[in-house]
Amino acid sequence: MSGWIITAAAVLLIGVAVLFLLSVTARVPGNLRVRDGRLAPCPASPNCVCSQADDSEHWIAPLTVNGDVGGAMARLRTVVLETPRTVVTEETAVYLRVEFRSAIFRFVDDAEFWLEPEIRRIHLRSCSRAGHSDLGVNRQRAEWIRRAFTLVDRPASRSPAGSFGDATGDVPTAAETH
């Protein structure tokens, strides 16, 4: 019985060591950024989603900008940074790249967001650096970001008071108050 426990513990320890090694040796992919109007394609593995993917396994809808286009990336940045263990690694007026780290093994997922202001759309790509499957984490996170962005990305609302006309008739003049 004790031989079985020692073997199981050794296998578990080796597995943890391999996962840790994968985590610390994974490098930033060289194909990130927008090239010719497109984010990098997803690899064949299921650990990636992209709004510009050509296949349904990897495709995810882009974000729609409903509010001010000029402030869209700042609003998105605020939403993205609500995610734990997130670091912004690159940022321009129309592009945001972040790294998400997992809690236990510190695996890194690279995410990119690219604003096309003329069509009020933010394309996104999120992909794990290491491993094959992410158990749907990139898709779930991207959908959470979409929901949160939709909540903060509202057009500036107009006050309903503007539809009632000039309110000066309701204010008594100096002669009426004396």
Name what the model sees in each region:
Residues 4-8, 18-178:
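Ser/Thr-rich, low-complexity intrinsically disordered terminal regions
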